[in-house]
Amino acid sequence: IYDDVGSINSISFGYYKKLQERGIPCVTFNPFKPLISVVMNNRDHRKIFVVDGYIGFTGGINLADEYINKVKRFGYWKDTGVRIEGEAVWSLTAMFLEMWNYINRSTEDYSRFLPSVYREKEFTSDGFVQPYGDSPLDNENVGENIYLNIINRAKNYVYIFTPYLIIDHEMLICLSNAAKSGVDVRIVTPGVPDKKAVYLLTQSYYEPLLKNGVKIFQYTPGFCLLYTSPSPRDTR
């Protein structure tokens, strides 16, 4: 699955057909139509890579040369990815299949994609890992609600890498209140923008956040596209 608008400048129209001809099932999310419609704003920026149900990768890395700095479009490109093993991988598989069924109007049997062999080492952990997604199919803002909950519970610090600092009033107040309460709130944004309009909008939030004690830094070597953002972290 790839997002049609997100790939519009990098691959040819109808590229999914070429993959299908080579035996690779492929579909596009929300194909672009030259119409004025709010539906066109529904995009899928998730990156999901699952191998045999045992290993999963997610993060901000797309399939493009700038992500390995083979091509420098916006200075040095900094990104991140996470490798997951064990039961948590199933959440990534389920998110993919949910979107696959929606696009194809199909009812793919999820159980077919469960790991066929139980590997005790991979499924033994004293922690809790729960990948989650946020999509137009949801009836609530899953991602934002999780961020708000984490930030509100933080005791020591909240560190955020984000390529686009575009927040609503509730998130602005949440970050400000955390900083005022003594939590060390830091936000890192790109020093080199990939979209100037979005960059200006990002900067418009600097003043109210700084006034309330939030520390803001810019990644001057280039563009930091850590799409796992905001990624608040806290030690207790």
Regions picked out by a protein language model, each given a short descriptive name:
Residues 102, 164, 181, 234-235:
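A very general structural signal that marks isolated residues within well-ordered alpha-helical segments
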Residues 227-236:
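Single conserved hydrophobic/aromatic residue that forms the stacking wall/gate
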